[in-house]
A protein has these predicted regions:
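Glycosyltransferase catalytic domains, chiefly GT-A lineage
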Residues: 2-344
Length: 344
């Protein structure tokens, strides 16, 4: 049985139960928020459908918000079954080709997709998501207070971030700032989540929450694609590694992290009203064993949104920490994910 067939069979009863649990929410209380994620043929198709289903099932007052699925690259069409499934979940699907300048880099899809939705749909808040994430609870912090314009999580590890003048990636950040006419010194300092390095603010692109009226997503796309046109890339070695959608080959690995650097510049050139979300959001499940033990003990049972990367693949499912006793899953969620996985 395909993943789409499994999801389709599992959804009706759970959706009814979720509707019953959410009946205390008046429709007028529904936040004006749009959720945006990419979908393409292959494993990304299954991941995106699981994400959208999790929103409809487990996000409380957010469960009826607008959902947008985009296929921004040519040649990555989704299946007819997936189209029907998106219709069942009331997801707006757009297959306009948007990523024409950097199609070798899959992460560029979310940049183009976010800018496109921000430009054509009107929402108070946009939530940009990686497809290999899902929700387990109501993400109440998506309702931004008046003094906050963007909510994000720091990068998991330092990676291509800069720690300052003597850092091997500092020249890249300064060149990027010059390209985008952003003052390097105005970018605040932050700390990476796993390895606790002091770095210029750099955010994980798997979850980005912004006020759409500010145009941060369009600025993100402007900055990123301008840097691509000017050949500004972080120093890198040619190597392949595993990510949520599969193995990242050399052409994409040379650009890895560059879209997130552009995001930081887009945010800090627009506003100083930025909040870092707690680690119950966009939790890096693939790095669970590397999270500070005290933090993991406190946070892991209460996860609201997690980034599982490849851990629902058949070869990784048996060691997926999400299914550990004492973890964040309810009985219903455990059964739901057991019936929906492995993803392929």
């Amino acid at each position: 049985m395909s993943i789409i067939e499994r999801l389709k069979r599992a959804l009706p009863a759970r959706l009814k139960a979720s509707t019953d649990r959410s009946s205390s929410f008046d429709e007028t209380e529904r936040p004006d928020i749009g959720f945006v994620a990419c979908i393409e043929g292959g494993v990304l198709e299954a991941q995106a459908l699981l994400l959208f289903e999790s929103i409809r099932l487990y996000t409380g007052r957010f469960r009826n918000c607008s959902l947008y699925a985009l296929s921004p690259r040519a040649g990555y069409e989704i299946s007819t079954q997936a189209r029907r499934r998106l219709d069942d979940l009331e997801v707006h699907y757009l297959d306009t080709v948007l990523n024409t300048e950097c199609p070798e880099y899959g992460s560029a899809n979310r940049v183009a997709a976010a800018a496109h939705i921000e430009g054509i749909y009107s929402h108070n808040i946009l939530v940009i998501l990686d497809s290999d994430t899902l929700f387990l609870g109501e993400p109440s912090k998506f309702i931004l207070p008046p003094d906050i314009d963007a909510a994000v999580r720091p990068v998991d590890a330092k990676g291509i971030s800069t720690a300052g003048t003597n850092d091997p990636f500092d020249a890249y950040w300064r060149n990027l700032c010059n390209c985008c006419d952003v003052d390097y010194d105005e970018i605040t300092w932050s700390e990476s989540f796993i390895d606790h390095k002091r770095i210029k603010a750099n955010y994980n692109g798997g979850l980005v929450v912004v006020r759409s009226e500010l145009g941060i997503m369009r600025r993100w796309a402007d900055f990123f694609f301008k840097s691509i046109r000017q050949g500004i890339r972080p120093p890198s070695d040619d190597y392949s590694f595993r990510a949520g959608a599969g193995w990242v080959e050399q052409a994409a690995s040379r650009l890895w992290g560059s879209n997130q650097a552009a995001l930081s510049l887009a945010i800090w050139s627009t506003t100083r009203q930025v909040k870092e979300l707690p680690p119950t959001y966009n939790y890096p499940l693939h790095l669970h064993d590397h999270v500070d033990r005290a933090v993991a003990k406190s946070v892991f049972p209460k996860l609201l949104h997690l980034h599982y990367h490849w851990l629902f693949a058949e070869d990784a499912l048996s060691t997926n920490p999400l299914f550990l006793r004492g973890g964040p899953l309810s009985v219903d969620q455990r059964n739901w994910l057991r019936s929906a996985t492995p993803l392929s």
